[in-house]
Design a protein with these regions (language model features):
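Conserved oxyanion/phosphate-binding beta-strand-loop segments in alpha/beta enzyme cores
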Residues: 21-38, 121-137
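Alpha-amylase-like alpha-glycosidases and glucanotransferases acting on alpha-linked glucans and related
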Residues: 88-176
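Alpha-helical packing segments of well-folded alpha/beta enzyme cores
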Residues: 16-19, 63, 67, 169-176
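Transmembrane beta-barrel strand/turn architecture of Gram-negative outer membrane proteins
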Residues: 71-80
Length: 176
């Protein structure tokens, strides 16, 4: 059952903290949480808009840090469901990647070199940005795919994992 401590109808970090002793008493030694980062929640938080900000519906970054502290105090573990394959279209990286002028985020996502043509076995969006090309999406149209590169390139627009865009994506996700 959800523990809602602020009356908005959604379980939150403080609610989990209040139930930790009960969870421990059940014999659990770990808690696995759904994505709890800032998100427009078009897919239950799996469309992350900011990996460095807790979703306000669950609490603050300070509340999340306190949750970690309280969990560890009880010799338990906490696992956060990290979504490294895509972000939300609301993510600042994606907004920058959509710009026509090259910038540090241009190759952070997987873009084709043309808005025309059908991609085999890949969902994509076209006509949503200033730049030429379509962006590959994961699962839903509001989840643009992050670019980690392609080991077996079959298209000219696919980048190697060692190219600057994929390397920057990997380096940033390692910081998350």
């Amino acid at each position: 059952r959800d523990r809602d401590t602020n009356g908005d109808g959604i379980g939150d970090f403080q609610g989990i903290i209040e139930r930790l002793d009960y969870i421990k008493k059940l014999g659990c030694n770990a808690i696995w949480m759904n994505p709890c980062f800032a998100s427009p929640f078009g897919d239950a938080g799996y469309d992350v808009a900011d990996y460095y900000q807790a979703a306000p519906r669950y609490g603050t970054n300070a509340d999340l840090k306190r949750l970690f502290h309280e969990v560890h105090k009880r010799d338990m573990h906490i696992l956060l469901d990290l979504v490294p394959g895509h972000t939300s279209v609301a993510h600042p990286w994606f907004k920058e990647s959509c710009k026509a002028d090259r910038n540090e985020f241009t190759d952070r996502y997987i873009w084709t070199d043309s808005t025309w043509g059908q991609l085999e076995n890949m969902g994509s969006l076209c006509g949503i940005s200033e730049r030429e090309g379509s962006v590959i999406v994961n699962f839903f149209a509001h989840q643009p795919a992050l670019n980690y590169g392609f080991y077996k390139k079959t298209q000219g627009w696919q980048q190697d994992p060692d190219d600057p865009g994929p390397k920057a994506t990997l380096a940033e996700m390692e910081n998350v």
